[in-house]
């Protein structure tokens, strides 16, 4: 194990940056239960005649990280890549896995160790080279072997990947792996051009080349990303727009104002503070849907050298003593906090599995109580001074700061004093990877299979294990859940994981967003599903 120390960059951040110790300025008061809200996953073109051409502008709430399917970790990268890089599989509005660049769902051998994926014939990459099984193997091998890959753990215990012919990929496993199709319905399944990979190497993300309705044009850092219609796309007659410009607008008020003015035609992540007013305005429509993912708090319990590395030891009470983290959990009134901060639009969460998932169980839906008196008892048992002071790193947008201030106010009665460290979103992604934080608030947009929401975050050495958490029992349960084919068995195993995680508290799950996307009424063909991605590939002006 690494030497006992506090993460070095955290010391630098706290010394050099301005840390906000804000008075309890957000009231945490319970409100009426949230009313039922029906999902609106898309606005269809239907019988209307779409206009061919035009430049659609989408206001993007945060800047994407690298446009590289193998290494990226940002939801906002998925927005852009959805238009540029098609996957072997996708999900539909109901969360069902459907073929995209694969021609059918995978077939699995009786022993569960061999998976065969049929690949479509005919599609071409944006550079003109053909899609075939060999190209898929090149992508999967890169995901499995590239240093810094965030996809390796998503693909499971692969023994080898090969082609059986030009139209079939065969994946052999060391042990059965049930979530493969779900993994290939996200970034792990985005097929990259072998020619571009050979030419660009590690710089592929600067100019990604895939099969998609659009191809990459340019990126102006912190400003915009532009893509254009790809005439080589196999379904080019279904693509209407000439270009899409993703314009970075981190302020929710500015996104809403630009939507009202028509300067942008689509805007993601509208603030719950604005939604009720926007819903009454002429010329603006709203899509809303639930989430497979979560927003939560990550505690750095061992991330001393970056994700994917062996956990170290951090010699602070909140890192080494689970009683202190449990006390923090007991200090938070989720319902009051979420309702007061987000105008009753979001839903409380206590695990990595959404209640509507087929893998949900009573154990995964159970929540810690709000018990500040017990929290103070735990702090006393741990022998830490009260108030116990911690630093919470969070994104510097208005909603995140509002949430952080509400958390700050909520935990006072439990014996905590929270200093808020605002960080720009893309920088915060790097901060969590490096372990340069004490406590951090971020979330995960979610995957249809719970493996994608848990394994890489909670398994020892996982690519997204930002907390540096390591528990052999959790490792075993997650492996067993990935190997099991039966839904009920998997649900039971994930429930057991939830119980342990709620005891150890490397992550505390707080709430699930409703993805709220605005659009102007002169466009249609826009969709968003529970994976959080706004889909524009079939959008059009009317």
Annotate each predicted stretch with a short phrase:
Residues 47-49, 106, 317, 322-326, ...:
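Extracytoplasmic/peripheral linker and loop segments enriched in polar/acidic and small residues
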Residues 56-110, 141, 209:
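N-terminal lobe/hinge region of extracytoplasmic solute-binding protein
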Residues 347-381, 399:
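Structural transition elements
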């Amino acid at each position: 194990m690494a030497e006992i120390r506090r993460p070095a960059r955290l010391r630098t951040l706290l010394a050099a940056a301005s840390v906000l110790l804000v008075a309890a300025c957000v009231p945490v008061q319970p409100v009426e239960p949230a009313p039922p809200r029906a999902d609106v996953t898309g606005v269809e073109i239907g019988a209307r005649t779409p206009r061919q051409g035009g430049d659609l502008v989408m206001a993007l709430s945060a800047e994407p990280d690298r446009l590289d399917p193998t290494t990226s970790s940002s939801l906002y990268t998925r927005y852009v890549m959805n238009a540029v890089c098609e996957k072997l599989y996708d999900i539909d509005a109901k969360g069902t896995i459907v073929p995209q660049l694969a021609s059918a769902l995978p077939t699995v051998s009786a022993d569960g160790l061999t998976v065969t994926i049929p690949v479509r014939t005919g599609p071409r990459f944006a550079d003109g080279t053909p899609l075939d099984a060999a190209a898929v193997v090149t992508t999967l091998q890169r995901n499995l072997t590239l240093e810094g890959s965030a996809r390796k753990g998503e693909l499971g215990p692969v023994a080898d990947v090969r082609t059986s012919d030009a139209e079939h990929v065969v994946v052999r496993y060391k042990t059965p792996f049930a979530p493969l199709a779900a993994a290939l319905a996200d970034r792990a399944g985005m097929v990259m051009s072998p020619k571009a990979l050979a030419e660009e190497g590690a710089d592929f993300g600067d100019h990604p080349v895939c099969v998609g309705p659009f191809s990459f044009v340019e990126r102006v850092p912190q400003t915009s990303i532009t893509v254009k219609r790809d005439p080589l796309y196999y379904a080019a007659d279904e693509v209407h727009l000439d270009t899409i410009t993703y314009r970075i607008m981190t302020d929710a008020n500015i996104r809403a104002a630009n939507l009202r003015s028509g300067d942008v035609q689509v805007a993601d992540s509208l603030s719950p503070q604005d939604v009720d007013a926007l819903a009454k305005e002429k010329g603006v429509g709203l899509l809303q849907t639930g989430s497979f993912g979560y927003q939560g708090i990550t505690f750095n319990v061992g991330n001393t050298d970056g994700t994917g590395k062996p956990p170290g030891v951090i010699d602070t009470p909140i890192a080494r003593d689970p009683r202190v983290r449990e006390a923090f959990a007991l200090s938070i009134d989720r319902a009051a906090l979420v309702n007061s901060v987000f105008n009753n639009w979001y839903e409380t969460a206590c695990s990595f599995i959404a209640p509507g998932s087929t893998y949900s169980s009573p154990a995964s839906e159970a929540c810690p109580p709000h018990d500040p008196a017990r929290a103070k008892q735990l702090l006393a048992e741990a022998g830490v001074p009260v108030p116990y002071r911690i630093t919470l790193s969070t994104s510097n947008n208005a909603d995140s700061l509002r949430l952080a201030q509400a958390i700050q106010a909520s935990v006072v009665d439990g014996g905590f004093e929270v200093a808020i460290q605002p960080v720009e979103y893309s920088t915060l992604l790097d901060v969590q990877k490096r372990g340069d934080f004490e406590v951090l608030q971020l979330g995960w947009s979610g995957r249809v299979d719970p493996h994608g929401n848990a394994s890489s975050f909670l398994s020892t050495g996982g690519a997204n294990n930002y907390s540096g958490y390591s528990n052999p029992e959790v490792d075993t349960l997650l492996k067993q859940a990935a190997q099991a084919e039966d839904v009920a068995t998997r649900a039971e195993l994930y429930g057991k994981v939830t119980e342990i995680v709620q005891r150890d508290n490397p992550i505390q799950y707080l709430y699930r967003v409703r993805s709220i996307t605005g659009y102007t009424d002169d466009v249609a063909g826009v969709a968003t599903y529970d994976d959080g991605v706004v889909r524009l590939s079939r959008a059009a002006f009317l």
